[in-house]
């Protein structure tokens, strides 16, 4: 039986919750109430972005594969350097790249400098995935 979108979402959240590279109370999860941005240090925001689907086979019945991106936005205060963000990005990539669970397959990822504003510098860690 094909993995549903909800099962995929939960598998990704479970994987993020097993990540030990940053305290869990510093990660903002989708639809989780009550997150407060820390006054100091690193913090992250997890977003699961679904992509297009495609038919990968039509044996007895069509097999549709779903695509998407696991996006982890990583933030640190300005003027604290970028080493901590770089190490966190490396750790997140190592944690997610080529991970699989049931019909979820995480592919390669990247860490991209996303800029800064008046308070934070931001890196985006993005890992592509396929389901089914």
Residue ranges and their predicted role:
Residues 62-78, 121-132:
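Oligomerization/assembly interface segments of phage tail-like spikes and tubes
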Residues 50-53, 66-70, 92-97, 128-129:
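Short, surface-exposed linear patches
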Residues 1-60, 80-91, 99, 117:
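Small/polar-rich, solvent-exposed N-terminal microdomains that initiate assembly or binding
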Residues 75-82, 101-106:
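Short C-terminal domain-edge/linker segments immediately following a structured domain
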Residues 48-51, 61-68, 72, 103, ...:
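Alpha-helical context
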Residues 18, 90-132:
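Acidic-leaning, charged glycine-interspersed low-complexity segments
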């Amino acid at each position: 039986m094909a993995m549903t979108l909800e099962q995929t979402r939960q598998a990704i959240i479970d994987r993020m919750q097993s990540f030990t590279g940053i305290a869990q109370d510093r990660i903002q999860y989708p639809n989780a109430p009550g997150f407060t941005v820390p006054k100091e240090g690193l913090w992250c925001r997890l977003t699961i972005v679904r992509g297009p689907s495609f038919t990968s086979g039509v044996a007895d019945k069509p097999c549709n594969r779903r695509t998407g991106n696991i996006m982890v936005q990583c933030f640190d205060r300005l003027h604290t350097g970028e080493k901590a963000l770089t190490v966190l990005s490396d750790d997140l990539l190592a944690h997610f790249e080529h991970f699989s669970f049931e019909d979820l397959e995480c592919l390669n990822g990247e860490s991209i400098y996303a800029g800064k504003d008046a308070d934070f510098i931001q890196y985006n860690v993005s890992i592509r995935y396929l389901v089914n």
